[in-house]
């Protein structure tokens, strides 16, 4: 409803798919994603995309749940053996891959963390790398931005990263990433990172920064519903 009131044409709903949510990583706990097919495709005049923000969990760029075996449905019936990640991704239009817990990357080389992001981008459902500027994991910006460009995928410039009380250092990092996206021709998204309804569609901080660096409008996937959907279908089919 908030998206409709703010004149949005398209809303991507990407709740966290992460070990942060539950102590037990079962299909029952992540049933919300399994039921995405029951969500409407339009609500109050706003078209809806179904997705998730999925955690990268190791230096190989694996996504959370890739190694968690699922052999039953949410009702307990036996199903074809698969993984939790496969079950969650099945009905997602796209995924944002991001890092939250990062102890596993503590002593990693720049080459390793860079390859981690490149590997994550190669997942068939991953469209966007999320909040790179505040992940706390150093990497080769040019290499990752170039890989995203070559795959037709996106780098997120995250509103919440620029709206924090400690945002000054993060803003420098995010600005640098955005500038390299502009210079290398890589598409960006600018997610509101809304964890509450009143922040849906909020992107003032990102918008101001992009204006300041004269970011090319044609590289902003969120400039229109048609632009985002076109980029999604070009990248993921």
Task: Go through the PLM ranges and name each one.
Residues 16, 186-201:
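Short acidic/histidine-rich active-site segments
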Residues 1-14:
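Catalytic domains of carbohydrate-active enzymes, especially glycoside hydrolases
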Residues 174-192:
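Conserved short secondary-structure transition element at the edge of the structured enzyme core
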Residues 23-27, 138-145, 165-180, 197-211, ...:
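Histidine/acidic-residue-rich catalytic or RNA/ligand-binding cores of hydrolases
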Residues 11-13, 156-157, 188-191:
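Short hydrophobic alpha-helical runs that function as membrane-insertion/retention elements
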Residues 17, 21-157, 211-214, 227-237:
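Extended substrate/RNA-proximal surfaces in nucleic-acid metabolism proteins
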Residues 162:
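Active-site environment of non-heme Fe oxygenases that use a 2-His-1-carboxylate facial triad
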